[in-house]
Amino acid sequence: MMVLGRIVAPFGVQGWLKIHPFGDDPAAWRKMTHWWLAEDPDGPESAWVQYKLASCRPHGKGLVALLEGVPDRNAAEAIEGRYVGAPRDAMPAPEKDEYYWGDLVGLDVVNETDETLGRVSGLISTGAHDVLQVEDGETERLIPFVAAYVLDVDLAARRIRVAWQKDW
């Protein structure tokens, strides 16, 4: 399951939900017919409950959405704080040279001389660009996810090649 965001609050009295998206393209979520909700983003697949998306629109830096089965504010309050996710195959296909963060987490990172720098443990959005969090034991590297440093992303090989030195 790919975690997309989190329900942060009810919105109004008719069951609408305010959503904080974790990615930079929440408008793509409107193309999905269903969302899945869970209390624990790392929980088993069976813990995710499917909801049909009735309506969704941008609101500030996030979204507001209406899910079937959430008819009023009380029902919205009952699911406040839950994570929003979707199976990978339910997601719209990314454009060329675009990636879902969930597809990058867990990839090995190597530099131009094939030195292993670690594995992607997460990403950070800084506003200007995204940053890879690369862990290698006790060492964490923060590598900007921009063309100047990221030379190649090979999802099939589960590897990212970067212009970055091991001692940086």
Swiss-Prot record:
InterPro entries (alphabetical): PRC_barrel-like_sf, PRC_RimM, RimM, RimM_N, RimM_N_sf, Transl_B-barrel_sf
Assigned keywords, A-Z: Chaperone, Cytoplasm, Ribosome biogenesis, rRNA processing
Domain PRC barrel: 96-168
Gene Ontology, cellular component aspect: cytoplasm; ribosome
Gene Ontology terms for molecular function: ribosome binding
Function: An accessory protein needed during the final step in the assembly of 30S ribosomal subunit, possibly for assembly of the head region. Essential for efficient processing of 16S rRNA. May be needed both before and after RbfA during the maturation of 16S rRNA. It has affinity for free ribosomal 30S subunits but not for 70S ribosomes.
HAMAP family: Ribosome_mat_RimM
Protein name per the record: Ribosome maturation factor RimM
Organism: Azoarcus sp. (strain BH72)
Lineage: Bacteria, Pseudomonadati, Pseudomonadota, Betaproteobacteria, Rhodocyclales
Gene: rimM
